[in-house]
Amino acid sequence: MTYNITIGNKTIEITESGYNILKAILDIEFSPPTVVSFCSLGGYSAQHVNHWLNHFTLFGVLDYEGINSTTFRLLKLNKDFELFITNNQ
């Protein structure tokens, strides 16, 4: 399976963990600014989640700021993208 995100007219292949982290973020009841625990996003390490938050910021999907080693503040979430899985078989 291939995990993808389409933003505007650009499609980017992402990892399964990146897909799962973004899906978990989309499930958050978001009203800016929302404080989020790294461990609430699929059980990945804070470093791994932070890695993907940086990618999603560069992609224009969200904006965030770190608070400490366990939480971050979700400042903006652009829902103008499509997250999808394709089967390569």
Which role fits each region the language model picked out?
Residues 12-40:
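Short amphipathic alpha-helical interface segments
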Residues 43-58:
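Short amphipathic alpha-helical interaction segments
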Residues 1-11:
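Long, low-complexity, charged/polar intrinsically disordered regions in eukaryotic proteins
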Residues 57-67:
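A short, conserved structural fragment
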Residues 21-24, 52, 84:
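Charge-rich, solvent-exposed alpha-helical interaction surfaces
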Residues 28-31, 59, 87:
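Surface-exposed polar/charged interaction patches
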Residues 9-18, 67-89:
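Short, cationic-aromatic polyanion-contact patches
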Residues 34, 52, 77-80:
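N-terminal leader/targeting signatures
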